[in-house]
C-alpha cells in the first residue's frame, strides 16, 4: 500500500486567487490555523443568497473562489453561481479544477504512456525530463485485470491473483516504474481492492489541505476519475464523477474541466428502512425513481430526516449507482455520520477535527436544524416504503419486487424473448450429468464495487452461506461462483466474523 494520504498535502501549483469578494479567512482546528475561502464572507461581500445553495453547488462555488485568476475563472463566473438561485438552473459554463484524479489500470496505463512520451520529447529538446510530472495528485488503483479462472474453492482468490500477475507482468512493471519516476503519482497494487472502495476507505479525506506561500489552505476534497462509478465517494461528501481519459489527463496536468453549472435535483429521504430490507433494495428503488424523473447531466443531492437513519456505507451504495440512474453524481452532505466513518476508517484525529470545523464554518455541515437548500426540483421517498427487490432482466432501473419475481420472469420470457413455449424445456449439457433450462442461475458473483462496499449486505451473504451449509445445501454444478472483496477491510471483517469459511465452502 502506498504511503498514507492522511499526511499528504496537495503539491500542485496554485496561483493566488484574485479574491474579488474578499473572502479569504482563517480558522483553527485542533490548534492548527488554516486559511480558507469563506462562503459566508463571500455572501456578505456581494454573493447574496448563496447560503441557500445546494451543498454540492457550494463546493463548486468554493472551487471558483479559490481559483479566480481573471482568465479561466472570472468574477462573473462566480456571480453566475449565485444567480443560479433565480431560476434554479444556468447556461453558464465554468472551469472546475478537481483536487485530484483517480484512475484504474485499464484507463490509467495510456496516461502513464503519455507522460513517458512527454519526458522523451523533453529530453530530445534538451530539457530536463524530470520536470514532466502530474500537477494534480493521481492515484492509480490496479483492479480491472482480474479474471475468474478458479472458483468454488478457498484457494480460488490466490490462484486468480497469481494468474493476474502472470498475464499482466509487463503492464504492472511499467506502472511500478511510473510510481517511482513521477511525482504526484501513486499506484495501489493488485489484490488490494476495487478502486472506488479503496478511495472511500483510504484515499478520500473530505477536506484537503495545501501548503501555500501564505500558509496552509483548507478546501473540499474533489476529484474526477476514469471510471463511471467514481461517484461512489459522494457518499463521503467528496464531489466527484467519472470522465473520459483525455479529460482526466487534462486535469492531471492542471487544466480545468469545463462544465455547465448543473441543475440540482433534491431527493428527500424520510423514515427508516424496515427489518429485512437491504441497501440493495433501497438503491434499486432510488434508481427506478430517478430514471423515471430524468436526471441525466444533473446533480442529485440527498437531504431530509431519513439521512439520520442511513449509515455511510448505504450512502456510498446509492452514490455508486449514479451512472445507472443517469446523474452526474449523487451527493450527500457532511454530517455526524461522515465524521463517524472517518474515525472508523482510521483517519487521523486532526483531519477529522478539520473536516468538522471547516464544514461548520462554510455552511457545509448538515444537522437536524439545517434548513433545506434550494433545488431545481425535488423527489421524496419514505424509507419505510422500500421492499425487497431485484432488477432485470437487463437494466438496473427495471426494479421488480421480490414477491413478483416469478411472474416477472415468465412475462419477460414471453414478451421480450418470445420463448414462452420453452418455459419448461430442459437441455442436457454434453459431457455433464445435468441439464439446463431458461431461468437457471449459472453465475453467482459478488464482485462489484456496489455490492462489496456495504458491510450489511456482505455479512448477510455470509450468514446466508452459513445457514445454507447447516441445512446441507450445496451449489448446483452448473453455477459458477466468485467473490472479489472490495478491499482488504472486507476480507478482514468477513474472516473475523467467521463467515469467510462459509463463503469459501460455497
Regions found by a protein language model. Give the residues of each.
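Fe-S-dependent hydro-lyases/dehydratases of central metabolism
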Residues: 2-506
Amino acid at each position: 500500500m502506498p504511503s498514507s494520504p492522511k499526511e499528504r498535502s496537495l503539491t500542485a501549483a496554485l496561483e493566488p486567487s484574485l479574491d474579488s469578494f474578499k473572502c479569504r479567512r482563517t480558522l483553527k482546528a485542533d490548534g492548527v490555523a488554516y486559511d480558507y475561502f469563506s462562503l459566508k464572507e463571500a455572501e456578505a461581500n456581494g454573493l447574496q443568497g448563496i447560503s441557500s445553495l445546494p451543498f454540492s453547488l457550494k463546493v463548486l462555488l468554493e472551487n471558483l473562489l479559490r481559483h479566480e485568476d481573471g482568465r479561466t475563472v472570472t468574477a462573473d463566473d462566480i456571480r453566475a453561481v449565485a444567480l443560479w438561485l433565480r431560476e434554479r438552473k444556468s447556461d453558464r459554463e465554468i472551469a472546475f479544477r478537481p483536487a485530484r484524479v483517480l484512475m484504474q489500470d485499464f484507463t490509467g496505463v495510456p496516461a502513464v504512456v503519455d507522460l513517458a512520451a512527454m519526458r522523451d520529447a523533453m529530453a530530445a529538446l534538451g530539457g530536463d525530463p524530470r520536470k514532466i510530472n502530474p500537477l494534480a495528485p493521481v492515484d492509480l488503483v490496479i483492479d480491472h485485470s482480474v479474471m475468474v479462472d478458479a472458483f468454488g474453492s478457498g484457494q480460488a482468490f490466490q490462484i486468480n491473483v497469481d494468474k493476474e500477475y502472470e498475464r499482466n507482468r509487463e503492464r504492472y512493471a511499467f506502472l511500478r516504474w511510473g510510481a517511482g519516476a513521477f511525482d504526484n503519482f501513486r499506484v495501489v497494487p493488485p489484490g488490494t481492492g476495487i478502486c472506488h472502495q479503496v478511495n472511500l476507505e483510504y484515499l478520500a479525506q473530505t477536506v484537503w489541505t495545501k501548503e501555500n506561500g501564505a500558509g496552509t489552505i483548507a478546501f473540499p476534497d474533489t476529484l474526477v476519475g476514469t471510471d463511471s462509478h467514481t461517484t461512489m465517494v459522494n457518499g463521503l461528501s467528496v464531489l466527484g464523477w467519472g470522465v473520459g481519459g483525455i479529460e482526466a489527463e487534462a486535469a492531471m496536468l492542471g487544466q480545468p474541466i469545463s462544465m455547465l453549472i448543473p441543475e440540482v435535483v433534491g431527493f428527500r429521504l424520510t423514515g427508516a428502512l424496515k427489518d429485512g430490507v437491504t441497501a440493495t433494495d433501497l438503491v434499486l428503488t432510488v434508481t427506478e425513481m430517478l430514471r423515471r424523473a430524468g436526471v441525466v447531466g444533473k446533480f442529485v443531492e440527498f437531504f431530509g430526516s431519513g439521512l439520520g437513519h442511513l449509515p455511510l456505507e448505504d450512502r456510498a451504495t446509492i452514490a455508486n449507482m449514479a451512472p445507472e440512474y443517469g446523474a452526474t453524481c449523487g451527493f450527500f452532505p457532511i454530517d455526524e455520520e461522515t465524521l463517524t466513518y472517518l474515525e472508523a476508517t482510521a483517519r487521523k484525529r486532526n483531519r477529522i477535527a478539520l473536516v468538522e470545523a471547516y464544514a461548520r464554518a462554510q455552511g457545509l455541515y448538515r444537522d437536524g436544524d439545517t434548513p433545506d437548500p434550494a433545488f431545481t426540483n425535488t423527489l421524496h421517498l419514505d424509507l419505510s416504503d422500500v421492499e425487497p427487490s431485484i432488477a432485470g432482466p437487463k437494466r438496473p432501473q427495471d426494479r421488480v419486487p421480490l414477491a413478483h419475481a416469478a411472474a416477472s420472469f415468465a412475462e419477460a420470457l414471453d414478451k421480450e424473448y418470445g420463448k414462452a413455449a420453452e418455459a419448461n424445456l430442459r437441455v442436457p449439457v454434453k459431457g455433464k450429468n445435468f441439464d439446463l433450462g431458461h431461468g437457471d442461475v449459472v453465475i453467482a458473483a459478488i464482485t462489484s464495487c456496489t455490492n462489496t462496499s456495504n458491510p450489511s449486505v456482505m455479512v448477510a451473504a455470509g450468514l446466508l452461506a452459513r445457514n445454507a451449509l447447516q441445512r446441507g445445501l450445496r451449489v448446483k454444478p452448473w453455477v459458477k461462483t466468485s467473490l472479489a472483496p472490495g478491499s482488504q477491510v472486507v476480507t478482514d471483517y468477513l474472516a473475523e466474523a467467521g463467515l469467510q469459511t462459509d463463503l469459501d465452502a460455497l
